[in-house]
């Protein structure tokens, strides 16, 4: 299967996030098709439109629909290049392959102010993970809306004095941030105490470029978002609180 082969290639090149997208997309296509055996001849515009309708009926967001369609389009185009499928101009024209904001991700000002206050003792007592989650969220906010993936993979060596230099996981772009005193204080409070670990925070334990570590990151991300959901509930916030909110709140300021 071309998609399976592409997934293995991504793993070999350490693109585990991309391989995860291909795997999720392929699973959705197989579920819709009812079989792993899918000929490229069957992938006509009627098939694509039906697949789009199927995804929406499964409550997939438009951005998820777009991700799956763009993945299928990439697989189809590779098949065309290898003369395994026919070239059809604008083959994916009538299905959604764009991006849209399905919901408002930036926090309301009142919610941000509530988050900035120390958690009431009756809330955080015995719930260190909730405190740590709140701290990570603020660090992401103060570090120019840093994505959770970059926070998780930060190394101790990335911080020299009050300067943090790191490379974006998604784009490879090198970024330098001068840390404010309050940011430094928060980092020192929650940084990794394991001297043998290269990571700045105790989020990951495995080697940087292994599939096991990527899976560990996926689990950490799900737990982080779950803890943020708990924070929203205990603080009675009106805004949606997720790993994206710190980034989008930074952009909206």
PLM features: residue spans?
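Single conserved hydrophobic/aromatic residue that forms the stacking wall/gate
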Residues: 1-12
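Conserved tyrosine-mediated DNA breakage-rejoining catalytic core shared by Y-recombinases
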Residues: 93, 153-189
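N-terminal DNA-binding recognition helix of tyrosine site-specific recombinases/integrases
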Residues: 28-32, 41-43, 57-91, 144
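Active-site/catalytic core of tyrosine-dependent DNA strand-transfer enzymes
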Residues: 112, 180-238
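Flexible interdomain linker/hinge and immediately adjacent N-terminus
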Residues: 49-50, 85-120, 207-214
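A Lys/Arg-rich helix-loop hairpin that forms a DNA/phosphate-binding surface
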Residues: 17-20, 33-53, 243
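Short, basic (Lys/Arg/His-rich) helix/loop patches that form interaction surfaces
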Residues: 121-127, 196, 225-253
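C-terminal catalytic core of tyrosine-transesterase DNA break-rejoin enzymes
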Residues: 138, 142, 146-149, 247-253
């Amino acid at each position: 299967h071309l998609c399976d082969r592409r997934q293995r290639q991504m793993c070999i090149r350490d693109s585990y996030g991309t391989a995860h997208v291909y795997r999720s997309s392929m699973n959705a296509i197989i579920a819709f098709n009812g079989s792993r055996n899918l000929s490229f001849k069957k992938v006509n515009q009627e098939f694509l439109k039906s697949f789009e309708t199927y995804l929406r009926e499964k409550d997939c967001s438009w951005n998820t629909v777009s991700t799956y369609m763009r993945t299928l389009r990439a697989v189809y185009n590779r098949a065309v290049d290898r003369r395994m499928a026919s070239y059809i101009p604008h083959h994916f024209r009538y299905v959604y392959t764009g991006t849209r904001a399905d919901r408002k991700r930036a926090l309301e000002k009142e919610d941000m102010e509530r988050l900035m206050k120390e958690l009431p003792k009756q809330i955080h007592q015995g719930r260190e993970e909730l405190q740590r989650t709140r701290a990570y969220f603020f660090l992401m906010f103060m570090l120019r809306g840093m994505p959770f993936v970059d926070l998780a993979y930060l190394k101790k060596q990335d911080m020299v004095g009050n300067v943090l230099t790191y490379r974006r996981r998604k784009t490879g772009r090198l970024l330098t941030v001068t840390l404010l005193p309050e940011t430094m204080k928060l980092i020192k409070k929650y940084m990794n105490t394991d001297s043998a670990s290269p990571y700045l925070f105790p989020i990951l334990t495995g080697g940087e470029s292994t599939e096991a570590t990527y899976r560990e990151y996926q689990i950490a991300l799900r737990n982080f978002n779950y803890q943020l959901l708990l924070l929203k509930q205990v603080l009675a916030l009106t805004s949606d609180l997720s790993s994206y909110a710190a980034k989008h709140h930074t952009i909206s300021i």
